[in-house]
Amino acid sequence: MSSSRPGFSCSWLPYLLVLPQLAITAVFFLWPAGEALWYSVQMLDPFGLSSEFVGLSNFIALFHDEYYLASFYTTLIFSSLVAGIGLVVSLFLAAMVDYVLRGSRIYQTLMILPYAVAPAVAAVLWIFLFNPGLGLITHFLASLGYNWNHAQNSGQAMFLVVLASVWKQISYNFLFFLAALQSIPRSLVEAAAIDGAGPVRRFFNLVLPLISPVSFFLLVVNLVYAFFDTFPVIDAATGGGPMQATTTLIYKIYREGFAGLDLSSSAAQSVVLMLLVIGLTVIQFRFVERKVRYQ
């Protein structure tokens, strides 16, 4: 019995259907990326009215700027903490729901709520909790003899923005991990238990390999989130301070491009950030994906 694949009556209809998405990609990604590449090799005035070709001078100046190199290091630390802690905590919570509280819709709903909160609002929420004078958490820490002031302590400021960023992303990770865990046949877990495998061994030798495709997908998503989507959290919580301790690459681009009106430097930083993200993505797909089991 032969089966025929349904097709379009008009040969140009498929292209017409994808045209809006192609237009959006061209206008909001390709065009800005091209502009950034062009501006990165130009010396622009603050208003962008005149320019002079300077080649790679903007990039050379970047890597001789100690503040830029510091923001580079801060970005790597911040993104690693946000992605790593977020994935581990989300997987733990999803495992608790799947194995302990399975079917608890109220608990699942409460876990999803943080995703509906805007990043800036999430930052403000944690600022209130950690306010040096009025915060509930700081009051508790003071009773233990610990002085908290993230406006003066760089380590505390980094802890605050990481905490707010992780809390904001946990719901997204939780949904994918829970769906992956609940898709595993119970018969496999029960068979492993009958063979004498304990809960920890079952999780690491059976469950974790089966959800590795979802884990790999979330690793890529969380790194991109940490690089780009945490800007509102940092801006609302610390403003990049104290002493640029929480200034990531994306926030430094904003500060120099929009606040300092140094368009050439911000464009060069945008190109470096784009190349960094592309490089990390290639590394993940070349090396990390090899350990992913899709069957």
Curated annotation (Swiss-Prot):
- Signal peptide residues on this chain, from the entry's feature table: none
Record-level GO cellular component terms: plasma membrane
According to its UniProt record, where is this protein mainly located? Answer: membrane
**All ranges on the Periplasmic side of the membrane:** 33-80, 131-157, 229-262
Membrane disposition: Multi-pass membrane protein
Localization recorded for this chain is:
Cell inner membrane
Q: Which residues cross the membrane?
A: 12-32, 81-101, 110-130, 158-178, 208-228, 263-283
Superkingdom as given in the UniProt entry: Bacteria
Subunit structure and binding partners: The complex is composed of two ATP-binding proteins (UgpC), two transmembrane proteins (UgpA and UgpE) and a solute-binding protein (UgpB).
Its recorded name reads: sn-glycerol-3-phosphate transport system permease protein UgpA
Question: What organism is recorded for this protein?
Answer: Yersinia enterocolitica serotype O:8 / biotype 1B (strain NCTC 13174 / 8081)
Per UniProt, what is the name of the gene that codes for the protein in this document?
Answer: ugpA
